[in-house]
Amino acid sequence: MPLRVVGAGRANEGLRADWQEQLATVQREIGFQYIRMHGILNDDMGVYTEDSHGNPQYNFQYVDALYDALLKLHIRPFVELTFMPSKLASGPQTVFWWKGNITPPKDPAKWSALIRAFTAHLKERYGEDEITHWYFEVWNEPDLHNLFFTGNVDDYLALYKNTAEAIKTECPACRMGGPASAVPWKFEEAFEQYIVANNVPAAFVSSHAYGVTKGFLDAAGNAGTVLDPSPDSISGRMKHSRELIQHSGRPNMELHFTEWSSSYTPTDYLHDQYHEASFILDKIKRAVPYVDSMSYWTFTDIFEENGPRFTPFHGGFGLMNLEGIRKPSYFAYRFLGQLGTEDIASDDSQSWITRSSDGSIQALLWDYTPIVPPAPETDQSFYKKEQPATVKGTLQLRLDHLRDGNYQVTIYTIGYGKNDAYTAYLHMGAPSQITRAQLENLNAVSKGEPESTERYQVNHGKFSRDLPLRTNDVYLVVLTPSEVFDATPKKASR
């Protein structure tokens, strides 16, 4: 589940070569199943216009170029159906630098025809069996009135019904849902009541969650935010959303959190810091019982809601920065991608122990110590600065019931100064533009290579290791049977 879905900014950005190159790296080293982004129907995707007589004209060339590239990288679209093509819009209101229109359609019949044509085209190009594995989400955060949607809850529900029925007409087995809400829980409850009362198709409920206690979402990304230190931030929101579904008339619907992160602004330097890695692991581990997926917002800092960014690190959402430098958050997901398929019980909540079919054991361990900026500071000022870790003592790893024999023990780390490109960037003087040599140096300190490797003889089924622990350190300890390790082709470092 943790590697099911990841986010990206907007569809048109996905046509860029550097965006696709970064996603190729993500897929090679992590491997998500789905990707969600804004704006597949935006004017910059050229999907819809009208002739001089008001007759609809459809064009899916940019959509094809994007979706072809995604499928080639073995990642499927989690289709967010936004925003309103200007020729269909009922008003001029837009959001972001790239001007996504946030109004309902002026002609619901023309909107329905567009959705039918879009779905029929996808079915023809990719096959009905393929697109039944996709998800179709209607709109984005319609509960943020006049930010993402100018209508009210009734307007959204009417839009949802129109859209879902149009998709079902062309693809009866396709999966659609909503409301992609930002605020708990008004729209979720209204959505669930409406689809039951009106027999409207829906396969899933979607919502968003961010781990802050202060601030608000503004299109310019200037609001100050403060980390929520509660253990139940993120997961508590998801738990209640699951309970709402269970008590609805459709208790078997899936629950997808199609955006989540530590903060909802692309100017929060916690996103760049090493603390984000342990935050991600802790929140995912707590949320797993409640959700079918949670889509980290986003995989890349190639993200233009506020327009092109002027520095290589600026608190952007991405797992990778503009130049493709891997952040500590990237390695949290990479470590998750190295876990095995069978969970093993652990008595420590800040751990994830697994086994692979070849007998390898993976122990993912972390210290999550939330550090709240002292008032009146916010994440924007506090986490912009270097944040040395504090020594906490020794982490004791003890594994029992292993098969006796020789193992290759490989240890990977994330933390202050370890796979920590942002701290290295600060030590360079935080240049507003980086040279090729500086880029090479930053990539060199964030390659994810093992901290140590050694052979270990397991006797009586036991393995033990003491590891030095600082605040927000992360360890991945992999025990691979020597015969498996020796037979595995070794990859060259990139």
What are the residue ranges of the model-derived segments?
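Conserved, mostly hydrophobic/aromatic
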Residues: V5, L70, F118, F136, ...
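Short, acidic/polar
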Residues: E13-Q27, K186-I195, A277-K283
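Mature N-terminal, pre-catalytic/accessory segment of carbohydrate-active enzymes
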Residues: M1-Q33, T471, E483-R494
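Substrate-binding cleft and catalytic face of glycoside hydrolase catalytic domains
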Residues: I30-P229, H240, P251, T265
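Aromatic/acidic polysaccharide-binding cleft in carbohydrate-active enzymes
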Residues: F257-Y383, G415
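Short, solvent-exposed loop/turn elements at domain surfaces
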Residues: M1, N12-A17, M45-G46, G215, ...
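Carbohydrate-binding surface patches
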Residues: D347-A430, S464-D466, T471-V478
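C-terminal beta-strand-rich structural cap/linker in extracellular carbohydrate-active enzymes
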Residues: Q433-R494
